[in-house]
């Protein structure tokens, strides 16, 4: 993740972070800054990250700024406060937004 800049265009937050590679850019606990690895568990208020050394660390979402490697290869910088809440609710909202866009674009074609 070193040396890559996040894209500045409007991005959707990935609906689930589990399995994605992340890096903690800022945190109120200085020992967690720079932590890099893969999200193994996403809970309502925390992330459990499997580090490159093989340890599992818990990071509180509301106190962190993280960078996520999205499936398309882009890097997205996210404030943890945006991620607070049940991840499954975020999936439902994401599906609703995508399906709504598809419906509105199909109306424009006719």
Swiss-Prot record:
Catalytic activity: Endonucleolytic cleavage of RNA, removing 5'-extranucleotides from tRNA precursor
SUPFAM superfamilies: Rof/RNase P subunit-like (SSF101744)
Top-tier EC class: hydrolase
Gene Ontology MF term list: ribonuclease P activity; RNA binding
Compartment list: Cytoplasm
GO CC annotations, alphabetized: cytoplasm; ribonuclease P complex
Protein's GO biological process: tRNA 5'-leader removal
Keywords of the record: Cytoplasm, Endonuclease, Hydrolase, Nuclease, tRNA processing
Membrane-traversing stretches: none
Top-level taxon of the source organism: Archaea
Enzyme nomenclature, EC number: 3.1.26.5
Function in brief: Part of ribonuclease P, a protein complex that generates mature tRNA molecules by cleaving their 5'-ends.
Family: Belongs to the eukaryotic/archaeal RNase P protein component 1 family.
Subunit structure: Consists of a catalytic RNA component and at least 4-5 protein subunits.
Name of the protein: Ribonuclease P protein component 1
Organism: Aeropyrum pernix (strain ATCC 700893 / DSM 11879 / JCM 9820 / NBRC 100138 / K1)
């Amino acid at each position: 993740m070193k040396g890559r800049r996040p894209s500045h265009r409007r991005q959707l937050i990935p609906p689930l972070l589990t399995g994605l590679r992340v890096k903690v850019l800022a945190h109120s606990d200085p020992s967690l800054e720079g932590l890099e690895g893969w999200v193994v568990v996403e809970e309502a208020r925390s992330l459990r990250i499997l580090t490159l050394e093989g340890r599992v660390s818990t990071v509180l979402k509301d106190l962190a700024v993280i960078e996520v490697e999205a499936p398309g290869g882009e890097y997205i910088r996210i404030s943890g406060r945006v991620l607070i809440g049940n991840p499954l609710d975020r999936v439902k909202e994401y599906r609703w937004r995508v399906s709504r866009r598809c419906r509105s674009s199909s109306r424009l074609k006719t």
